[in-house]
């Protein structure tokens, strides 16, 4: 299976963010790791292996990317307004920066899927409900 690591500078967050893409063709699925997770956790917990046949058949691609949950959702001592604003910046990074970058990189012209586990599932559902123009 083709695996490609990438970094993209986020203007919204003011930093580089990492991601990894599994597969080279098929519908892209944006996979959000569990709470406080990193881009490599989706594979480390066996989720990529679970769909490896679909990836190898060229039916799907998995794009797993970093969250900033430690600075937002899990930062219980932080200022609630600042945490919320930072989370919204991360949301805009995913939708306005990472999504177009990945879609251009893959050449896929339809809407992408979104998936995740635990808090990642919450984030995935949030992308789906807030941006049905991007995710189906």
What are these regions (language model features)?
Residues 1-136:
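Non-catalytic cap/lid and distal C-terminal segments of serine-dependent acyl enzymes
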């Amino acid at each position: 299976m083709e695996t490609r690591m990438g970094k993209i500078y986020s203007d919204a967050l003011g930093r580089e963010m990492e991601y990894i893409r599994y597969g080279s063709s098929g519908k892209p699925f944006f996979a959000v790791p569990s709470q406080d997770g990193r881009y490599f956790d989706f594979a480390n917990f066996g989720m990529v292996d679970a769909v490896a046949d679909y990836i190898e058949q060229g039916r799907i691609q998995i794009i797993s990317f970093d969250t900033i949950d430690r600075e937002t959702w899990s930062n219980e001592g932080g200022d609630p307004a600042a945490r919320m604003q930072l989370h919204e910046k991360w949301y805009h990074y995913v939708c306005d920066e990472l999504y177009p970058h990945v879609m251009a990189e893959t050449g896929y012209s339809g809407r992408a899927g979104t998936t995740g586990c635990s808090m990642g599932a919450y984030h995935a559902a949030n992308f789906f409900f807030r941006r049905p123009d991007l995710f189906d």
